[in-house]
């Protein structure tokens, strides 16, 4: 939300209106869009307590709390469901969750696919009683959908939920780090989940940058990374369309093949 507001403010002099932004949520299995922000209306931002979110609860932040305060998390609404479509948020056991509780997003409606071509196993896994299991985590508040991340990407350390995108975005703001080319994921260390960071950066003082990343992650998320890999520019894998291949850095790390400027 901060970047969107900054963009709208910068180009307001040229006649740009913030209401031109149309946040939405969708996927190919639903013939793209599932929810859409009403045209011509200002975007809706939810300000929640960051600590509560670690427990899966989108509790409203204290009134008057500064948006830049680490205890406050802002999420942009992805809009409301299209007519004839339904949303449901469920727990790991499939129980329907109340508003402001984070769970897996399910949807059903006339645009949802009946299944995957010649892949019955994938169809059975994704579609149950007509409900498409999206694999995305989110919550609903006042009819609006808020997306938090991917279920399979969720990092759970000491019982607290951490969304890798939040960690990656924060690290990406550090000088020298290539924004959008940061990956946070968890690995098993002696039976416990541990955090690993891989970040592309310009060649320089990798040791100092690791310390900056360690401080940032500790101060904002209360976590201590087990390993921080400073990777040369262009080494972290992406798809042909520029999307992050989130599984690849984890696989490279586990195989000991993640290229680095220098070893720790």
Q: Model-found features: residue ranges?
A:
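Extended hydrophobic secondary-structure segments that form protein cores and membrane-embedded regions
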Residues: 21-25, 105, 197-199, 228-231
